């Protein structure tokens, strides 16, 4: 018969995403990157509700609507400003944790059975700010990416002891099914 049952609850931190980076210097290249991303795109596509078109990158839209890039040909773009100094700031935060509820049993000192239910959770935020200036003008590009999620997975294990000196075991862990919610934002101030 059943000799004992054990129940366990645990919390484990799987990842920590906290870090901050600041880089300063000349020629950061925000507007040049906007031009490169926009080359090949005619101005008419940026004039009428470009946010509704998933084929148009948000850097192109922000550069155009922030008056940082100008068309020079039908589908070629150049910088409308000449920034010389820049500061890039990146801030990341968040964690991935796992909550586990487990059960184990000893049956007749011959069968050992274990079951586990794992619930991983995650939260991650990345904020980026790129500021560029010259003596007269300045621009700041800000972006934010935020993801949260929760998932589920299971484990099962079995050990058979046919004699005192021999144990045969097997275990199986399911893949984790996870649901994520992602939010992004971007804006430019000139």
Task: Give the predicted meaning of each segment.
Residues 3-190:
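Outer-membrane beta-barrel porins/channels
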């Amino acid at each position: 018969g059943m000799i004992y049952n054990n129940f366990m609850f645990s919390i484990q931190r799987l990842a920590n995403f906290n870090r901050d980076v600041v880089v300063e210097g000349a020629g950061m290249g925000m507007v040049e990157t906007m031009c490169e991303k926009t080359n090949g795109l005619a101005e008419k596509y940026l004039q009428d509700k470009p946010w509704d078109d998933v084929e148009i990158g948000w850097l192109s839209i922000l550069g155009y609507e922030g008056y940082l890039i100008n068309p020079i040909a039908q589908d070629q773009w150049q910088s409308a400003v000449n920034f010389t100094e820049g500061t890039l700031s990146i801030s990341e935060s968040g964690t991935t944790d796992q909550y586990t509820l487990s059960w184990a049993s000893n049956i007749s000192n011959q069968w050992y059975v274990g079951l586990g239910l794992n619930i991983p959770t995650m939260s991650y935020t990345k904020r980026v700010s790129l500021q560029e200036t010259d003596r007269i003008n300045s621009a700041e590009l800000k972006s934010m990416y935020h993801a949260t999620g929760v998932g589920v997975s299971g484990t099962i294990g079995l050990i058979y002891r046919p004699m005192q000196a021999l144990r045969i075991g097997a275990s199986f862990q399911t893949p984790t099914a996870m649901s994520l919610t992602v939010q992004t934002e971007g804006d430019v101030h000139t």
